Amino acid sequence: MTELILFDLDGTLTDSAPGITRCVQYALTYLGKPRYEPEELNCFLGPPLKEQFMKFAGLTEEEADTAVEQYRERYNGIGIYENEVYEGIPELLEFLKKHGKKLGVASSKPQVYVEEILRHFGLEKRFDVIVGSELDGT
């Protein structure tokens, strides 16, 4: 039987905190919310954006939709590239592939972003399966 090893993207393969927290701050500033230190926004690493905007900043559903739009406005051209692959990850993936393991990425981040980040860092060919959410959060 072939083994499949799944990895998350954010916080596992890449340190995406700088790009995510800067985009969150951009969205909150757009809505006239206070400025937060990047460390205060680390709670946005992982969970779905809309729900986290509502929980963290007390936004209404409509405001959270606007926050997500603003987040993505900055993320699409800038924030997506404000991250880096953790040290040793390329070597680990290569080792696992050489030992016959199937590798996959499963992320709550939209699939188009997952694929672009993996492409940007030259990692996409190391994965047999890449799964992310849709832009609408499904």
Which sequence ranges carry the predicted segments?
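Helix-loop "lid/cap" segments that line or gate small-molecule binding pockets
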Residues: 27-28, 48-61, 117
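Short alpha-helical
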Residues: 19, 48-51, 91, 112-113
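Hydrophobic "anchor" residues on beta-strands that sit immediately upstream
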Residues: 4, 104, 129
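Active-site neighborhood of HAD-like aspartate-dependent phosphohydrolases
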Residues: 1-43, 57
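Short, acidic loop-to-helix structural element flanking the phosphoryl-transfer center
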Residues: 77-105, 111-116
